[in-house]
Amino acid sequence: MNNMLGYLRNYKRESVLAPLFKMLEATFDLFVPLVMADIVNVGIAAHDLHYILVRCGILLVLAVIGLTCSLTAQYFSAKAAVGYSTSLRHALFAHIQSLSFSEMDTLGTSTLITRMTSDINQVQSGLNLFLRLFLRSPFVVIGAMVMAFTVNARAALIFVVAIPLLSVVVFGVMVITRPLYKTAQVRLDRVLGLTRENLTGVRVVRAFDKEQDEIDRFENANDLLTKMQLHVGHLSALMSPLTYVIINIAIVALLYVGSIEINVGGMASGDVIALVNYMNQILIELVKLANLIVQVSKALACAGRVQAVLDTKPGMDFPAELRSEVPADKAGDAVRFDHVSLTYAGAGAPSLSDISFTAKRGQTIGVIGGTGSGKSSLVNLIPRFYDATEGTVEILGRPAADYPREALRGKVNVVMQKAQLFGGTIRSNLLWGTPQATDAELWAALETAQAAEFVQAKPLGLDEPVEQGGRNLSGGQKQRLTSARAWVGKPDILILDDSASALDYATDAALRKALAALPGSLTVFIVSQRAASLQHADQILVLDDGRLVGLGTHDQLRQSCPVYEEIYESQFKKGDVQK
């Protein structure tokens, strides 16, 4: 938690001035009852209008000064809180970018979004309130008691009894409700999670006619949240009647003692009014202090969750520069797996077991297997999205761990299973990996990806707007644009992770033909469920339950690998010839 305080270092001045100006405001507030007492004791008693007007002028000055101090304190506290949350959000976002896929999988996308948004907002609100009240409220409570003793020591003894009773009620309710607020926050997170899940998967929900089930699930979670919030609200509502009962009893006692003191000449009627005002000030500040503690407790809980993400250490260490030279005997290697195994964090069994193969520069490597066989897991090791649990992955003759992040990702480009585009234009999406690419290079990449025709048909061409997630494009268009984006930078290794699933066979075949015609020694890994897409590959890797059960050409595997033959036969009738 101390690390998070470091983000306040640029706002030290505001963090000091905000509570100081609040204390100044409180100081002027403490003088108001005394001025009121003077008006009653002197001005009204003597029917001195001039005295009353002068004292009213003093009250007005105190109010203006107090308001100025309050607004100034609010400005400084808001500036510090907003600046702090902005710095914290930037740091958290930057830290998330440094995490590997393993940490991202463990934390979860919805959790990280919650930390970035509602948790940091709660920390900001708590800090803003803390800077304004953590000195003011105790100062007013103590100051009001001291001022009461300056008015009349005997009557002020009532404060000595009333303040502990008020404190017991206020802080007792706070202690009881504090853990309930935490439970309510957990249930609120659950409701938000269900909402996010439903909106993300709305097409699947409707495809399976599960709208009513989702409504019922949401209502159950929402009912639990509502019941908890009502329970907390009922307990919190006890604070007002109980505190006002104590205050009213204390005021009655003050009036009783005051009347006796007035009769014996020990105090004036205006002094009683001052004591009642001080009692009300104490009540207000105790309630504020209790609310402050509740809000700060929530903020600290949220800060702890943010800190937990910041404390998550990246599982991968990328060197600043290349660590090794390429041995002469590996100069022609593009990718080499040497007895590689992979077990995901928290998984009970390995996703890949003892995988070994070598892909030469310029080769096309097919990867095929059933659902859950480990195809994506295998290709994700090449750009080092994950580190192998056992064995070594070598890229262009060097261990993948010897490459700086930028160098490795510059040599290996990936077209993901799920096509992801970002809000902007077609041009801005294509320039993601290679900002300096020319229009000619962009159009060449679009031609290769079989996307040039539909981009040319757009009114603005490369400058056609793309909505967030590519919502204004079809699935096939998105896949072709992500493919074009991948080879704009002319990588050494290109991975197509089932990236043609939304394309028809003719477009898929044209894309593979265009890839084969690219100049240079581009090594291509094609992950596909279609045997026809891979039959012309130089090598085909056949995976089954995380193991490499076949390695060879299409014809070789049909003779030697039952798993491949089964996949092939399930897609084509016997005797069909694929060309």
Label for each model-derived stretch:
Residues 10-13, 98-102, 118-127, 131, ...:
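An intracellular "coupling" helix at the cytosolic face of ABC transporter transmembrane type-1 domains
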Residues 48-51, 147-161, 231-305, 309-310:
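Helix-loop-helix
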Residues 327-579:
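ABC-type nucleotide-binding domain
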Residues 1-31, 36, 44-60, 65, ...:
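Membrane-integrated ABC transporters
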Residues 46-47, 82, 90-114, 118-120, ...:
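Short intracellular "coupling" helices and adjacent cytoplasmic loop segments at the cytosolic face
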Residues 10, 14-27, 38, 59-62, ...:
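Transmembrane helices of ABC transporter permease
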